[in-house]
Amino acid sequence: MSDMELAELWVAVAFFVFVGILLYNGVHKALAKALDARGARIAAELDEARRLKEEAQKLVAEYKRKQREAEAEAEAIVTAAKAEAERLAAETKAKLEEFVSRRTRMAEDKIAQAEHQALADVKAFAADAAVQAAERILAASVPGTATGDRLLGQAIQDVRGKLN
């Protein structure tokens, strides 16, 4: 055996002795225990991460549901507001039409009253003119006697009664 082979042999022997000492002192148990603890810690972290992921998914689902509900509620509010606006517009239009109709009727009534009054004034004026004309004609045709004045007064009263 050469020196080189002898050195390799001693390194191998030293290695096996070292491993034997480690095994004898229970280092392998401590190492296994440390690895088991690390594995348990990693498993716990994975379980916690899984639990947090599920919780986050539940929260996301709940927020999406709330968002859909809020959108539906907003849409319902908009629909109700549009319906209310349409109702108010129709009500306002009806009130405006009623107001215009009432004002038109009032104007037509005033016009009819004015026409009636004008017609009555024209009739009264015509009656007075006819009476005055009749007075002049009768006064000219009948001399100024008491009977003539009486007949004239009676005729004037008859004409006034018929014309008015």
From Swiss-Prot:
Main location: membrane
GO molecular function per UniProt: proton-transporting ATP synthase activity, rotational mechanism; proton-transporting ATPase activity, rotational mechanism
Function: F(1)F(0) ATP synthase produces ATP from ADP in the presence of a proton or sodium gradient. F-type ATPases consist of two structural domains, F(1) containing the extramembraneous catalytic core and F(0) containing the membrane proton channel, linked together by a central stalk and a peripheral stalk. During catalysis, ATP synthesis in the catalytic domain of F(1) is coupled via a rotary mechanism of the central stalk subunits to proton translocation.
Cross-referenced InterPro entries: ATP_synth_b/b'su_bac/chlpt, ATP_synthase_B_chain
KW Transmembrane (keyword) present: yes
Keyword line: ATP synthesis, Cell inner membrane, Cell membrane, CF(0), Hydrogen ion transport, Ion transport, Membrane, Transmembrane, Transmembrane helix, Transport
Family the UniProt entry places it in: Belongs to the ATPase B chain family.
GO CC entries: plasma membrane; proton-transporting ATP synthase complex
Ranges that cross the membrane: 4-24
Cellular location(s): Cell inner membrane
HAMAP family tied to this protein: ATP_synth_b_bprime (MF_01398)
Source domain of life: Bacteria
Organism: Azorhizobium caulinodans (strain ATCC 43989 / DSM 5975 / JCM 20966 / LMG 6465 / NBRC 14845 / NCIMB 13405 / ORS 571)
Lipid bilayer topology: Single-pass membrane protein
The name this protein goes by in its record: ATP synthase subunit b 1
Description of how the protein assembles with itself and partners: F-type ATPases have 2 components, F(1) - the catalytic core - and F(0) - the membrane proton channel. F(1) has five subunits: alpha(3), beta(3), gamma(1), delta(1), epsilon(1). F(0) has three main subunits: a(1), b(2) and c(10-14). The alpha and beta chains form an alternating ring which encloses part of the gamma chain. F(1) is attached to F(0) by a central stalk formed by the gamma and epsilon chains, while a peripheral stalk is formed by the delta and b chains.
